């Protein structure tokens, strides 16, 4: 019993485990958010999307729904089970990322990006609240700084991984008619980066 109390104490081993899991979630958050930037040329070529539309997809559509849902989801984090809110949000934005690979044009892709923004809006307020419970006040600044590293990891991974998937798919299937299900490189990339969040 003493060992259990030590494990689950504020700032104890389980608190550190929670922090690591939240960093991983934040990493997935940024991967799914940033992956669009590495796919811009493929999207313009295959879907006929313009630079202006890409700017809308990358910025306005995502940010609007992130901001709109951020406040109510932050309030929900105060009232409901935070780990459940984070888990549901993670699955939702991961599914929306995968569905982005099925988009047939600007409208459907924008709708899926709306979904990504809405899902990701659940993560940060609930995580800040959760970590504040698991760590004492004199450690929260360093804990939140550590948590924030997930953003930089995610941004780096999204560009590197996205580029690798695109290059691999193009070299393996120069003629996409011969690719599995006729998938384009951008479609495979959306699906591959979204899937891990569902199983986490």
Placement of each model-derived feature along the sequence:
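Cytosolic juxtamembrane N-terminal segment immediately preceding the first transmembrane helix
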Residues: 1-31
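Extracellular/periplasmic helix-loop-helix junction of adjacent transmembrane segments
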Residues: 39-68
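Helix-breaking motifs and short loop linkers at transmembrane-helix boundaries and internal kinks
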Residues: 48, 81, 102-108, 119, ...
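Cytoplasmic helix-loop-helix junction between adjacent transmembrane helices
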Residues: 111-152
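Helix-loop-helix hairpin linking two adjacent transmembrane segments in secondary transporters
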Residues: 147, 151-200
């Amino acid at each position: 019993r003493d060992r259990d109390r030590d494990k689950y104490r504020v700032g104890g081993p389980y608190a550190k485990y929670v922090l690591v899991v939240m960093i991983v979630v934040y990493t997935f958050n940024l991967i799914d958010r940033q992956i669009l930037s590495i796919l811009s040329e493929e999207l313009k070529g295959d879907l006929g999307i313009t630079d202006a539309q890409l700017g809308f997809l990358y910025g306005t559509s995502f940010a609007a729904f992130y901001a709109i849902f951020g406040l109510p989801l932050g309030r929900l984090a105060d009232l409901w089970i935070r780990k459940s809110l984070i888990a549901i949000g993670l699955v939702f934005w991961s599914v929306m990322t995968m569905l982005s690979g099925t988009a047939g044009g600007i409208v459907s892709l924008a709708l899926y990006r709306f979904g990504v923004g809405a899902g990701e809006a659940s993560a940060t307020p609930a995580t800040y609240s959760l970590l504040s419970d698991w760590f004492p006040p004199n450690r929260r600044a360093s804990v939140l700084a550590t948590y924030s590293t997930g953003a930089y990891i995610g941004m780096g991974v999204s560009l590197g991984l996205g580029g690798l998937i695109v290059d691999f798919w193009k070299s393996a299937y120069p003629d996409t008619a011969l690719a599995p299900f006729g998938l384009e490189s951008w479609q495979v990339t959306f699906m591959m980066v979204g899937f891990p969040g569902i199983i986490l």
